[in-house]
UniProtKB/Swiss-Prot annotation:
This is Cytochrome P450 monooxygenase PC-20. It comes from the Eukaryota. Gene3D superfamilies: Cytochrome P450. Belongs to the cytochrome P450 family. Keywords: Heme, Iron, Membrane, Metal-binding, Monooxygenase, Oxidoreductase, Transmembrane, Transmembrane helix. Its main location: membrane. It is found in: Membrane. The gene is PC-20. It is an enzyme of class 1 (oxidoreductase). Pathway: Secondary metabolite biosynthesis.
Length: 453
């Protein structure tokens, strides 16, 4: 009896064989492109996927994936520009930790900017969100955003922040009196968004009030962002059920803004940076002491006089050079940026920043010797695609430290036996994946009110 499936079987085998041959040819052709390029150990079968996967598996739970790139650079002693062949799972990338190359890519002959997928931020934010915006629209919107977020504009609006800063102090006092551990991430998120709302919209969302109705909605929204489909589904249903509350507050704020003549757009600030400022200052009490002395000197040892001066002479914030240096040094050590221009790797190069793993804010003081090499410190990027919210981000963090550092001690209390990364990445306070790298577990702290405050 003749096999009626014989021709079909033959055709199937030939088709499969042809497809496999094409895959092999394409793989070999692609891998050969990296044969003479600087890469970590590279195989014809997996490219650099094996190296990256091994690094991810060796990292603690929830580790922020971009920091694996710096670990790979160190482990294999890679040059300041190297390649990661991640095809076909991910796009292959060129990792840049060289200031001159970064300048060329962003200022001399600007390349297409990295664009975040709007799906990462939905349903809270749409494709019009600034990180998901097309380059042509970014170019159109960026000048207006920069004009609304100048250092002068931020200084002028500082006096409006007094009620919010008082609410922040009250919350910290309540946490201190409770004697309980508290994930400081929650309060810092509220603070950053509150400051952005006051400075850019001229109105408060009352996020720092203990009875805020809007605060838990925003927290849920931020927790929802990411790639976990189950968490996104669960939280998205909850968010959609309560958007009427959020929309009402925003509409009222925008209407009030229109009536008072204020304008601006909410920008994304590096919330993660506040966590690490506290973490590094706790680990370096000498820097904390020097920063407190600067606050006494520039403003007043008396808290009441400090508040009065802050409202009457907000330009004094510009004289907090060491406090700003603390913020910048934290940005250098925990810089994020993209996978192409790797700010973290650039900030950890010993030839650019002597003793690169040490927390040394003095390197950013005016007149510091050696000075910061040109184009090597670029946490907000440069050129026409730079972050428009950098003045707001820096000033809001300086204000945060001025408001809290002399009155409170925030002591991290990570669980005993908690996983940890390399010490140069924070140890138990390693960067955990979120929109940005937040301190692991939301940085649980004990808040102590200082006796001499």
């Amino acid at each position: 009896m003749r096999d009626s499936l014989g021709p079909f079987r033959t055709f199937t085998l030939l088709t499969v064989g042809l497809l496999l041959s094409l895959c092999v040819i394409k793989t070999v052709k692609h891998r050969r492109r990296y044969h003479r390029l600087p890469t970590p150990p590279h195989s014809m079968l997996l490219g650099n996927l094996g190296v990256v996967l091994a690094e991810i598996l060796a990292s603690p739970e929830g580790f922020f994936h971009l920091f694996c790139v710096e670990n790979i650079r160190r482990k294999y002693n890679m040059p300041s520009v190297f390649y990661l062949d991640l095809w076909p799972i991910l796009p292959s990338i060129m990792v840049v930790a060289e200031p001159a190359v970064a300048k060329h890519m962003t200022q001399v002959q600007p390349l297409q900017r990295e664009r975040f997928s709007p799906n990462l931020f939905s349903p809270l934010l749409t494709a019009e969100f600034i990180l998901a915006m097309e380059q042509k629209n970014w170019k159109k919107e960026n000048p207006a955003l920069n004009a609304a977020l100048t250092s002068t504009r931020v200084n002028e609006a500082t006096s409006l922040l007094a009620p919010s800063l008082h609410s922040l102090r009250s919350r910290l006092h309540s946490i201190s009196q409770s004697g309980k551990q508290y994930p400081i991430k929650d309060l810092l998120i509220s603070y950053i968004i509150e400051v952005g709302g006051v400075i850019q919209l001229g109105g408060s969302f009352d996020l720092l009030a203990e009875t805020s109705a809007l605060d838990p909605i925003i927290k849920r929204s931020l927790d929802m962002m990411g790639w976990n489909p189950v968490k996104r589904y669960i939280y998205s249903k909850e968010i959609k059920q309560r958007t009427d509350c959020l929309n009402k507050v925003l509409v009222e704020t925008i209407q009030n803004t229109a009536q008072t003549g204020e304008s601006g757009k909410m920008s994304q600030s590096p919330i993660y940076l506040a966590h690490y400022c506290y973490l590094f200052l706790h680990k370096h009490p000498d820097c904390l002491r020097e920063m407190r002395e600067e606050h006494d000197r520039v403003f007043s040892p008396d808290r009441t006089q400090t508040w009065e001066l802050l409202q009457k002479e907000p330009h004094r914030i510009n004289s907090l050079h060491f406090t700003l240096a603390v913020v910048k040094e934290t940005l250098r050590l925990i810089g994020v940026g993209g996978a192409f221009i790797c700010h973290l790797a650039m900030g950890r190069r010993a030839d650019l920043f002597p003793d690169p793993d040490a927390f040394r804010p003095h390197r950013f003081l005016p007149g510091a010797n050696p000075s910061i090499p040109a184009d090597s410190f670029r946490p907000f990027e440069k050129g026409h695609l730079s972050c428009p919210g950098q003045n707001l981000a820096l000033k809001s963090l300086v204000l945060l430290l001025l408001t809290t550092s002399r009155e409170f001690d925030l002591v991290p209390v990570f669980p005993k036996g908690a996983p940890q990364a390399a010490e140069y990445l924070g140890g138990k306070g390693y960067p955990e994946f979120h929109i940005g790298p937040h301190v692991n577990k939301g940085m649980p702290v004990m808040v102590h009110t200082r006796v001499d405050a």
